[in-house]
């Protein structure tokens, strides 16, 4: 299968290191292409791999990276319970954003080991899901310019920062779906103490038209920052039949 993800951050104003606007705007865009292959091993288990060329264009800077996702999936015979384990972003930059000491500055992609579980009700079009991400490291806090967050996050807060909860509405025909998710880490990091926002929440949906799958998602990072995502994917093998 082939997938395409395009993320446009929109027009952003130029500013100095103190946040003072200096005039003019610039754009930032990311393009991710997925080349996916999956193989069924028995009736309830499958494995898959996805190769991901990543192109980034930020103002006058650009980067090219190559990543790979590897995963396995199990479901019960009645398909009500699904379990998945995935290692994401195995790869590195082929071209960095800038030069350092006369050489390209290249970085590894942010590795992410994830475990997912979801359960679909038998007599209602509802599916509940939970994803536990970044299993390879416990401490997801980071220092800022004004304070060091290391050690200040309670253990139960850190535990929930590793989790993403979701609720899907999927009719029996499965020709479309709606989904709502909550990411506690995103809310903890992006929510401002004196402002209300939907940071951490995301709403999306999708539709299947012939052999194409179209998806759309909306999320709010801060009170004035919104992210709109659209995706298009199709199965090459089914298209050739």
Positions of PLM-derived features:
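Subset of outer-membrane beta-barrel
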Residues: 1-241
């Amino acid at each position: 299968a082939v997938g395409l993800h395009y993320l446009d951050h929109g027009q952003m104003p130029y500013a100095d290191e103190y946040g003072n606007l200096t005039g003019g705007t610039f754009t930032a865009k990311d393009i991710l292409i997925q080349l996916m292959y999956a193989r069924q091993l028995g009736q309830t288990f499958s494995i898959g791999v996805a190769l991901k060329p990543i192109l980034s264009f930020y103002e006058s800077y650009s980067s090219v990276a190559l990543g790979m996702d590897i995963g396995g999936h199990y479901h019960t015979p009645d398909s009500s319970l699904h379990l998945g384990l995935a290692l994401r972003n195995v790869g590195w930059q082929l071209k960095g954003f800038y030069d350092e000491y006369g050489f390209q500055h290249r970085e590894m992609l942010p590795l992410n080991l994830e475990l997912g579980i979801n359960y679909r009700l038998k007599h209602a079009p509802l599916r509940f899901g939970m994803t536990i991400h970044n299993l390879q490291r416990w401490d997801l806090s980071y220092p800022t310019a004004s304070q060091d967050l290391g050690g200040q996050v309670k253990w139960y807060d850190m535990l929930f920062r590793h989790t993403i909860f979701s609720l899907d509405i999927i009719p029996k025909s499965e020709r479309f779906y709606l989904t709502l998710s909550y990411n506690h880490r995103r809310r903890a990091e992006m929510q401002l103490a004196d402002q209300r926002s939907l940071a951490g929440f995301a709403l999306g949906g999708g539709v299947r038209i012939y052999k194409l799958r179209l998806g759309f998602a909306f999320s709010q990072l801060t009170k004035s920052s919104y992210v709109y995502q659209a995706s298009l994917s199709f199965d090459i093998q089914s298209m050739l039949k």
